[in-house]
Regions:
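Glycine-/small-residue-enriched capping loops at alpha/beta junctions
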Residues: 1-220
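Anionic group-transfer/hydrolysis microenvironments
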Residues: 45, 184, 227-229, 234, ...
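Alpha-helical metal-binding/catalytic segments enriched in His/Glu/Asp
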Residues: 166, 222, 233, 238-254
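Conserved mid-sequence domains
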Residues: 209, 215, 222, 226-235
Length: 254
């Protein structure tokens, strides 16, 4: 990355095409020093205005350029920062977010989340940022999983389907358990409102999904409640026709 008003360090600065790098936020220039094969210089804008969000955006822009070269690996030189871990995490997140594609219904798809051609992201830093890279990867993967689910139509992402995906999450993590209540269990628990809402859809069976993560233990209990209506038709008579297809995204709250 290059900040506005600054110049590339040598020997990269003497590489053909390097003078085209301006430092303007989101600007990109590719130079060919020989080793490595190519270097993408992305503008980071004013150094004083460089935030983790800008790092996230820069990483996303860089990924899209790298994708055009069918690159399998990206290496970042972490810009100097007071909190390098936060910026490292943001770079990984931005790369992961930009790699998301929804091709579930395209010919040849196996029905799972689309795999990216990118095999690795390396961040060069003198600081201990291993934890930050792991955090960024976790956030990106979880976000993209949610984006995949919200992109599915309501006839696929039914309450039963979401319960199955919750079960997959629990099976993949030792400290995560799942409990699912069906219509009978919901009714027995006195949750008449939830049961009533589900009657608005034909052949739709409600599910109450509870995922529990037991971490280190001994701390306070934190509960997050998400409404996941797989196709929200509430107030459909007063909603404009444009954007009706986005009602399926109401499930994102879960």
């Amino acid at each position: 990355g290059l900040f506005e008003g600054e110049e590339l360090s040598e020997p990269l600065g003497s590489t053909a095409g390097a003078r085209d790098a301006s430092g303007e936020f989101k600007s990109t220039v590719v130079v060919y020093p020989g080793h490595p094969e190519r270097v993408l210089v992305i503008g980071l804008g004013d150094r004083k205005e460089f935030t983790t969000e800008r790092a996230r955006v820069a990483a996303a822009v860089a990924y899209k350029v790298a994708k055009g070269f069918k690159a399998e690996a990206i290496a970042w030189v972490l810009p100097p920062a007071s909190e390098p871990g936060h910026y490292a995490s943001a770079l990984v997140e931005g790369t992961g977010f930009a790699s998301f594609e929804f091709d579930h219904f395209k010919s040849g798809s196996d029905g799972k989340e689309a795999a990216t051609e990118l095999k690795s992201v390396e961040i060069v830093s003198r600081d201990d940022i291993g934890w930050a890279i792991e955090l960024g990867e976790t956030i990106a993967n979880a976000t993209n999983r949610a984006r995949f689910l919200q992109s599915l139509p309501a006839n696929v992402a039914t309450p039963e389907y979401l319960a199955g995906r919750a079960g997959e999450i629990a099976d993949a993590h030792e400290k995560v358990t799942v409990e699912v209540l069906d219509r009978e269990g919901i009714s027995a628990a006195g949750m008449g409102g939830l049961e009533a809402v589900s009657k608005g859809g034909q052949h739709v069976e409600p599910r109450l999904i509870t995922l529990k993560y037991t971490g280190r233990g001994g701390g306070k209990v934190l509960g997050l409640v998400g409404k996941s209506v797989t196709f929200d038709t509430g107030g459909i008579s007063i909603k404009p026709s444009g954007g009706t297809e986005e009602m399926k995204m109401d499930m994102s709250a879960a």
